[in-house]
Every structure is written in C-alpha cells, then in structure tokens.
C-alpha cells in the first residue's frame, strides 16, 4: 500500500471527564506517522470537569477536530453519534485517556488491508495510572 492509496480515517472518541489526559491523547493522534487524511470526532458527554472547554479549544486550532454532543454520556451512544458524524469509511476508536504510539493508525490500516479484515483490535498497556 503506498501513500496514494491510503484510506482516510475517522478517529472517534467518547469523552467524559478526561480533563487530565485529553490534550495528550489528541496530540498523540495528531502526530501519527500516517499520510492519509485523519479527522478526530469527540463525542462530548456531560463532564463535571474542564473536558468540554479543553475540547473546544483544541477544535478551534485544528479543523480536523470535530465535536458532537453526547447528552447521556454513555459510551455506546457517544460512539454511535461520532460514527454518524464521521466522514470516512475507516473508523478508529480511541479512549480519551489513551496515548497511542505514532504508528498506531498506520499499523492498523496496514493489517486491515493485508488481511482483508473489516475490524481489528489489540491490547493496550498502561504506562501510568
């Protein structure tokens, strides 16, 4: 697969009370070693901290970040709302407190392409709390 054939990817995140980790999570997504298009869709639940303000600020400075309201705060509802707002066929689900490696999306897309898979998953390891 060369850069000209890389599919565009919608990264979706159901978000609730992620004030501490959200900026680092989004930064890791934006620094991906992936030359295809990437958009980030944050499904914002009714957070009791500064999550919504942080997300709004991040979206102001990068047009690839889109916000959608998730009034219930439920993960499944947030995922569905984010998928409905997504522009691309390939969906990558990330948790708002995660920091993915720089090759995460590239590796996932390569595996999907090579295996003809429509869904892949993997283990996540905690570096801290």
Feature locations, PLM:
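Acidic helix N-cap motif at the loop->helix transition within catalytic regions
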Residues: 23, 49-58, 103
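Short, acidic, metal-binding catalytic loop of nucleotide-sugar glycosyltransferases
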Residues: 27-37
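Short beta-strand/loop segment that forms part of the nucleotide-sugar
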Residues: 37-47, 66-71
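A conserved acidic beta->alpha catalytic loop
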Residues: 44-53, 98
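Glycine-rich, basic loop-to-helix element that forms the pyrophosphate-binding segment
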Residues: 70-86, 107
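Short aromatic/hydrophobic "clamp" motif used to bind/position activated sugar donors
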Residues: 91
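Conserved donor NDP-sugar-binding/catalytic core segment of glycosyltransferases
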Residues: 103-129
